[in-house]
Regions:
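Aromatic-anchored segments of alpha-helical transmembrane domains
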Residues: 10-17, 55-67, 129-139, 188-197, ...
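Hydrophobic, membrane-inserted alpha-helices
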Residues: 8-16, 32-37, 163-169, 185-194, ...
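Long extracytoplasmic/lumenal interhelical loops at the membrane interface
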Residues: 312-377
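Hydrophobic alpha-helical segments
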Residues: 355, 359-479
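Hydrophobic alpha-helical transmembrane segments
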Residues: 28-34, 89-96, 159-163, 371, ...
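N-terminal "leader" segments that precede or initiate the main folded domain
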Residues: 1-111, 213-218, 222-238, 434-444, ...
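Membrane-embedded catalytic interface detector for glycan/lipid assembly enzymes
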Residues: 98-253
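Aromatic-rich transmembrane-lumenal/periplasmic boundary elements in polytopic membrane proteins
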Residues: 232-340
Length: 479
C-alpha cells in the first residue's frame, strides 16, 4: 500500500477546508478515517466490495456530524447525548477493522495475473433465465423460512445467492461497454420489488450496480462519472421517500390482508404515497431528512450507553462477544433447541436506559458491535475483537480469491458475501458473526465446487485449442 503525494496533499487541503468551514476537528478526523479505511481495504483486483462496505460503515458513524455542520439541523444524538466520544470510538472501530483486513491480505499473495484463468462462467441467455427464475424463487424461500427454524439460516443464505445472480447480470451489462438503458431497467425492476416489500430492499440493487460500474470505471469517461452521480442522487432520494412513506405503508401492509398479498396493489400504493410526499411542504421534507439521518447515524443509543458504562453498569468482561461466538459454533441444524438470540432492543433498554420497541412489536432497535465491544472490554481493549474480525475477513477474502478460479464467479461471490458481511456498523456481534459465517460456509464452498466443475470444461477447451494450433507431427517411414 502506497500513499501518493498528490493524495496526501488533497486530503490535507480537504481537511483544512472542512475545519475552517465547520470550525470543528471531529469532521477532519472522520474524513481522515474514511480515507485510511478505504485505502487499507483496497484489494487491487478491481473488486471494491470491501472499500465500499467500510465507507458505508463510516457513513453510519459520521453522517450526523456533517449533517449538523452543513445544515445546522439537530437530531436526537446531537441534543440528547454526548455523541462525540462515541463517534471517536466508532471511527476507531472502522480503522481497526480495516487494519485487520489489510494485515491478513498482505500475508497471502494474490493469484498470478499472468496465469490464464477463465473470464465468463455462464452464457448470457442462461444468466438472464436464472435471474428471472430467482425473482420468483426468492419470495417462496422467504415465505417458507419461518416454518423451518432449524434450516432458516441456510435458507436465507441461499436466498442471498439471488443477489449474486443479479450482480453477474449487471456486470455482464457493463462489459465491454456499459449498456446504460438495460442497466437502468434491471435496477428499476429491483427498486420496485424492493420498495414493495416490508423492509427497504432497494439499497442492494443500487450498490451492486455501482460496484459493477466501478469494476470498469474510467476516470476519463464522463458517462461513468455521470452514472456514479445519478446512482448517488437516486439512492438519497429513494431513502428520503422511503423514510417519508414507510409508516403509513407498513401500517397498511400489516393491517390489510389483501394489500399484503397483492404486489400490484402495493406498487400502486407506494406510487400514491411517494407522489403525496414529493408534493408535501418543504418543512415536512426537512423533518423527514432529519428522521433519515437519525435512522442512519447509529450513534444515539450507543452514546447513551457509553455514559452509563462503567459509571452505572460494569463492564462485562467479554460476555457479549463470548455469547456471540458460542452462538455461531452451535448451528441450529445440529442444535435445534438452541434459544433465540436476545433482541438488540433488550440491550438498548438495559445499557442506554431507554424503553424502546422490541420483539413484542416485531421490531429491533440497533445497538451495534462497537458499543458491545466497549461494554465488554472498555477502551482500548475494545478494538482487539474488531481487529480480530478484520483478520478473519481478510483471510477469507484471500482464501476464496485463490480458490475460485473463474473471475466471474469470484467477483460475484466476493461482492455479495463481503459487502453483506461488513457494511453495517449497527449490527450486533452475534448478527455480524452469524451472517459472515453463514455466507462463508453455506455459500462459499458450493461456489468453489461449481468453479471446479466448470474448470474441467475450461481445461478441455484449452487442450482443444492447443491441438489446433500445434498439431502432432505425422509419423513417416524412414527412407
Amino acid at each position: 500500500m502506497r500513499f501518493a503525494d498528490i493524495e496526501l496533499v488533497a486530503v490535507g487541503l480537504v481537511g483544512a477546508t472542512v475545519y475552517f468551514a465547520m470550525n470543528d476537528w471531529l469532521p477532519v478526523v472522520s474524513l481522515a478515517t474514511l480515507y485510511l479505511s478505504v485505502k487499507l481495504t483496497l484489494t487491487n483486483d478491481r473488486v471494491f466490495a470491501l472499500p465500499l462496505a467500510l465507507a458505508f460503515q463510516w457513513t453510519q458513524t459520521s453522517l450526523g456530524v456533517f449533517y449538523y455542520g452543513i445544515t445546522g439541523r439537530t437530531v436526537p444524538a446531537i441534543y440528547g447525548s454526548d455523541y462525540r466520544p462515541m463517534v471517536v470510538l466508532a471511527l476507531g472501530c472502522c480503522l481497526a477493522l480495516a487494519v485487520g483486513i489489510r494485515v491478513r491480505l498482505m500475508t497471502r499473495a494474490a493469484p498470478d495475473p499472468s496465469v490464464p484463468r477463465p473470464g465468463f462462467a455462464f452464457g448470457y441467455g442462461l444468466l438472464v433465465s436464472c435471474y428471472v427464475g430467482s425473482i420468483f424463487i426468492e419470495g417462496s424461500l422467504l415465505q417458507i423460512a419461518p416454518y423451518y427454524p432449524t434450516f432458516r439460516q441456510i435458507i436465507t443464505t441461499l436466498d442471498t445467492a439471488r443477489l449474486g445472480v443479479l450482480f453477474l447480470l449487471l456486470r455482464r451489462l457493463c462489459s465491454p461497454k456499459p449498456q446504460w438503458s438495460l442497466i437502468a431497467t434491471v435496477v428499476g425492476i429491483e427498486i420496485v420489488l424492493g420498495m414493495t416489500g416490508f423492509f427497504a430492499g432497494f439499497r442492494e440493487p443500487i450498490v451492486l450496480a455501482a460496484l459493477a460500474v466501478m469494476e470498469v470505471f474510467d476516470r476519463r469517461n464522463r458517462q461513468h462519472w455521470a452514472a456514479v452521480g445519478v446512482a448517488t442522487v437516486v439512492a438519497m432520494l429513494l431513502g428520503l421517500i422511503w423514510m417519508g412513506i414507510r409508516g403509513e405503508y407498513r401500517r397498511e401492509y400489516t393491517e390489510l390482508d389483501q394489500f399484503g398479498q397483492s404486489r400490484s396493489a402495493r406498487i400502486n400504493r407506494v406510487r400514491d404515497l411517494a407522489t403525496g410526499f414529493l408534493n408535501a411542504d418543504p418543512e415536512d421534507m426537512w423533518r423527514t431528512a432529519d428522521a433519515l439521518v437519525e435512522r442512519m447515524w447509529a450513534i444515539y443509543y450507543p452514546a447513551l450507553a457509553l455514559e452509563r458504562v462503567p459509571k452505572v453498569l460494569p463492564h462485562t468482561g467479554g460476555a457479549i462477544v463470548s455469547a456471540a461466538l458460542t452462538h455461531i459454533v452451535t448451528p441450529r441444524v445440529f442444535f435445534p433447541d438452541k434459544p433465540e438470540l436476545p433482541s438488540d432492543s433488550d440491550s438498548v433498554r438495559k445499557y442506554a436506559n431507554v424503553h424502546v420497541a422490541g420483539r413484542e412489536n416485531n421490531t429491533s432497535i440497533a445497538f451495534g458491535y462497537s458499543i458491545e465491544s466497549y461494554i465488554d472490554f472498555g477502551g482500548p481493549m475494545m478494538f482487539l475483537p474488531v481487529f480480530g474480525f478484520g483478520l478473519f475477513v481478510g483471510a477469507a477474502y484471500a482464501l476464496f480469491r485463490t480458490a475460485i478460479w473463474h473471475r466471474e464467479l469470484f467477483v460475484a461471490f466476493a461482492t455479495v458475501a463481503f459487502w453483506l458481511s461488513v457494511y453495517l456498523f449497527e449490527r450486533s456481534w452475534a448478527t455480524m458473526l452469524g451472517t459472515t459465517m453463514s455466507l462463508m460456509i453455506y455459500l462459499g464452498p458450493p461456489i468453489v465446487v461449481l468453479d471446479r466443475f466448470l474448470l474441467v470444461r475450461f481445461a478441455a477447451d484449452r487442450s482443444r485449442e492447443k491441438a489446433m494450433l500445434f498439431p502432432a507431427p505425422l509419423n513417416q517411414d524412414r527412407v
